Amino acid sequence: NSNEAREEVKGHPLSFLRVGKPEIDLDPGIDLYDVRVYEKGKENLLKLIKDGIIAEDPERYFYVYAQTMDGRTQYGLVGCASVDDYWNDVIKKHEKTRKAKEEDRSNHVRVTNSHSGPIFLTYRDVNAINEIVDEVCKTTPDNDLVAIDGIRHQSWVIRDKQINAKIEQILAAVPCFYVA
């Protein structure tokens, strides 16, 4: 919630929570769905870009992301999905979402021109994707850090255009995805 996020970012001016939950930098009395909240998110994002903290990739890429906790590593493929797939039920929902929350996230994306919060999707196992992920993970990660909670986070950018095209082709053949 917003109060927990306010506590979390104290002493962390570069926290991306300031983009995804920008109300934490505003008076707590302001309504969460007020346009000023979205504008603050955009302002915070543009400051991170201007200061060189984050940058938009020059091309569309897929990424491999790994989390290691208690000796167990889980891997994921990171990319973008079409909102049309959500509305057309290619992406299956496991619960009813609140209309106000959907509109909130849509407004946030529209105003900031970014999607700051990941949505975890799962799909039936595809060996070809697993093989690509295995190969990518044999290389040195682009990012490798252990967070204060002890969880190790690693990520690899897949810059090879042919591999990205292959992943896109494979995923296009997946009949449906599920919100995890």
Can you name each region flagged by the protein language model?
Residues 1-178:
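A cross-family signal for N-terminal binding/gating loops and helix N-caps
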